[in-house]
């Protein structure tokens, strides 16, 4: 197979300069056919991109940077491509013999200007890949913005996820065209200079904030609830939430409660801001709340978070997120709660975050936020299945089954209510961890998947502070998390001995 990109030579960018495109682990050759510019770009765009590169990106090259030297190997069109990917807004060549003629569209329009217009209107666009041979929409997705710093960073993010979708289509595997949770947001469109100026101002403000405060600073909320909980009400109403105290220079996130052999513990990510690396810790809960101190239970040389727990064949297992290590590892509890041994590697050679498992119709299904090395971290859902927890695990026929920043990334345990399977998902439409949604799974098999978001949850009077990105329950105990402003001076002051309750276990008010 040969793939041909059609791009405007006057606006050649680094993301276009590639010899291959990775498709299902194979490097498929890419050739580029340069075309004349169909539409002029906003005045001074490349100068603004260069300013962002120097200030926002600290001089690091990015995918939206202009190519200074056009590679000779791409100057001529060989005419042998099997798949054409036309990134311009020019009319399709009616005599093109390629079996697929793919046209990315951004909020319904083609070309880089359409992507820029969406960004300048206040949001990343919905991406659709259209086969111009018959007009069919072959895939649809909405990228997340974790790496979208500035106008150039946003454009790079959009094109990275566009290539993800192109690779999935070119693989020949069936695609699931999702109905996205939300359309792209729009505001009054700013000019590029104003957009960049605002981005630089925001970046400076964030740097000042990070000098004064730990950012982000996550904390855990808990409550005992004898009645209908979040899953039944679709909101955060009910008994008030209490914040699990922390020492200030650590944050706690991703709470997973479990009762094992008569004792209940909440496991969570414990990140020391001074080190910048997470471990897994736990704290016991009694009938009235936390008991004793936080106990470290699992540490590796790499960052750990999201300690998903599952009981299987009489054993307790943990799958902490270890995406920086490039695998999905399974740990066995050999002494509860504080001794765990690595037992197996379920998946290797991939970047998969927040692995979460459910069982359905005799199979195990593992969901995770998948990333192919570029673009956002929270928009792509991959599913794997197996007959046994230890595997072997096989990929879903349509991976990634969904690209949607508002409903892809897992946010806690699956639940079954009245025979229906549900999962909490992160809603990152307004930024990473900004909110939660409750999604009902309508179809799930090795070849099908469909979910519908039924409820959305945001921080507010019932959960003050900022952000909300995990939901779990064990018996009466419900847990969530969020973030707050945490000044570094307060964290320093809290290290001195005092007569008050230990900050690790004392309840406090979310703020």
Name each model-derived stretch.
Residues 253-256, 305-310, 353-358, 410-415, ...:
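Beta-rich, blade/repeat-based domains predominating
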Residues 267-269, 319-321, 367-369, 424-426, ...:
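Residue-level marker for isolated small/hydroxyl-bearing positions within beta-strands
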Residues 430, 434-444, 451-453, 460-503:
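Blade-level signature of beta-propeller repeat domains, shared across WD40, Kelch, NHL, RCC1
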Residues 235-245, 289-297, 335-349, 384-406, ...:
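Blade-edge beta-strand/turn elements of extracellular beta-propeller
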Residues 320-335, 341-384:
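Active-site cradle of extracellular carbohydrate-active enzymes
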Residues 271-275, 323-326, 371-375, 428-431, ...:
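Short glycine/acidic-enriched loop and turn motifs that connect beta-strands
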Residues 359-390, 403-440:
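Loop/turn-rich, solvent-exposed surfaces of beta-rich toroidal or solenoidal domains
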Residues 1-265, 269-304, 308-311, 317, ...:
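One-carbon transfer enzymes
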